[in-house]
Amino acid sequence: MEEGDFSGSEPSEVTDGQNTNTTMTTETHTTTEHQPKPLVVRLLEVHNCDEDEEDEEEEQEEDHEAPKTHKSHEASVSFKSVNSSDSPKASDLPLSCKASDFLGSSKASDPSESFKALQSSESQEDVKDDLFSNAVIRTSPSLMTGYPPQLQLTSLRAHPATRDLVKKCFYSRKRVQDLSRPKKQWGTPDRRLFWGNQEPIRPVSEAALKAPSSKRIEDLAQPRLVSRHYVPNRVQYYYSCGRDSVIWEIPPPALITQPSKRIQKLAKPNRFKTQSLINRENLPGTLRYSDPSPRILRLSIAKGTDPNYIPPKTIQTKISFSTLSAVASPRIVDLAHPRIKIEGLCYERERSELPIRPVAPAALLANPSERTIFLAKSKRVHEDYLPVRDARWPISYAATHPQVSERIQELANPHTRSPTHVVYYDPDVFKVKPSALKAHCSNRVKELAEPIVR
């Protein structure tokens, strides 16, 4: 599509439904080279058309309904292309004046009244559209290309509710961007903290910041002079804020040197303070230290060793000089070496029937003596020895199939006790029968009474 197509204008026709063909041509010359009028010029034109408003309203009432409809449609087109048109016609001036009047009335009145007026104007336009349902509107392409993409001021003036919504959305964009960012972790500072960049807890006054320092403060602010003979043996930190402390390293000569007698004397603690020794003579007699008695002096002497005391023998073994100077023979040196095993702990087996360790042929052919045979036999167990019983042992058939006698049933019944509310004393409770005193236990009872020896 070329630029020449948009330079021309196409006529816009409106046809009513009462078989009346009325053609009105509106030519608007809008090109990309022409710029819209400034805002000040358009405001002056609106102000000038306020005076002729009454005359034009009377003329509009006398006109036919068809021109009214044409004007309404033409007003909608001219309202959308106010900024794009250079020379508006006389028919467009009343409509622009009406828009300015509507804007002024909306500023003077409440927002609710302006909104009602806007609804009434929209309802009138809907009624007109219903009356002329067969109307056809044609718009030239030049108007479409000349319309700027941004929002027009006239549209915002005609609709105050839309203007407030646009302002609200425009100013809330920064808030939406702030909320879209991720939250920072609580407690983490925005910047790294170093010594000297923290804000004070209490604000410093301007007088304190502007106060001149005295000569004494300047002298105290100077660092202490260090002797040229001083050699630091650790890392020097003026401020230890945020740094680890350094342990002093002790040089090796300090560990080897011995202190002098003077240093040893000064290292000992004083038994009494000097002031207490001076004031000691002025103390009363009750507080003075008394001299030791002869008994205390005698007890303070350590006891001597008894003349008949024999000290313990020394455990140290005395080795003779000849033993220390003896020279071992080659055979003794050979026997002193540990026995070397083949392949660690096992020996090579020639045949499977041979033992793991090889046996000498002389040992296999040797005849043992009677003493060796006697010692080779294992010791016998004592006749009364009972082997340790297993944790689980089989239960006999008689124990698994018992038959309860009448006596056992009688003993199985619980003992009947007399009621507690009846007081009964038996005088012969602890009396032993004479027959029980003269009874003799049988050998079987004695045997059962003895514990089993395991």
From Swiss-Prot:
Residues 1-129 are annotated as: Disordered. It comes from the Eukaryota. Keywords: Repeat. The keyword Repeat applies. Residues 65-74 have a biased composition (Basic and acidic residues). THEG repeats lie at residues 167-185, 207-226, 253-272, 286-305, 322-341, 362-381, 398-417, 435-454. InterPro entries: SPMAP2-like, THEG. The gene is Spmap2l. This is Sperm microtubule associated protein 2-like. Residues 50-64 have a biased composition (Acidic residues). Residues 9-18, 106-122 have a biased composition (Polar residues). Residues 19-29, 76-87 have a biased composition (Low complexity). SMART domains: THEG.
